């Protein structure tokens, strides 16, 4: 895998691309889901990404299936139409994201068991909690869930969904 270090992943991409943070985030998602742009194909991260896509495609064709990391879900060649290397990578990427999120949710529900604090909304990569005033320590326990999985987080708080 590629080591981004301790900093924010999109800030690292911004430095690689020599663009601002928002543009870096946009460029990264476009390339992960649509294919690596020629002007970035020599960056170490995208070299590794391209190699991962190529080896998965070869394995998929040779074995007739590809087994996803974490979930062990099998994408079977005889069940999927119009497959290509990038599309297969997208399927694997989304499966991996879902698998990681299930692990996060499982651990968070363990932290919240018996507590008044509740997870009230989960979308994609965001989690909204209604934190009981007497349970502020729960937030640190939730942060620890992400730390143990080596995931970076950003947090905001407020009295309503607008964080005011």
What are these regions (language model features)?
Residues 133-164:
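Polymerase palm active-site segment centered on the conserved acidic dipeptide of motif C
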Residues 8-122, 149-151:
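Conserved catalytic core of nucleic-acid polymerases
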Residues 125-131:
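A generic structural motif
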Residues 1, 14, 92-95, 138, ...:
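Structured N-terminal alpha/beta-domain signature
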Residues 35-38, 128, 136:
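Short acidic, S/G/P-rich loop/turn micro-motifs used as interaction or catalytic elements
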Residues 1-9:
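Extended active-site and interfacial segments that coordinate phosphate-rich ligands
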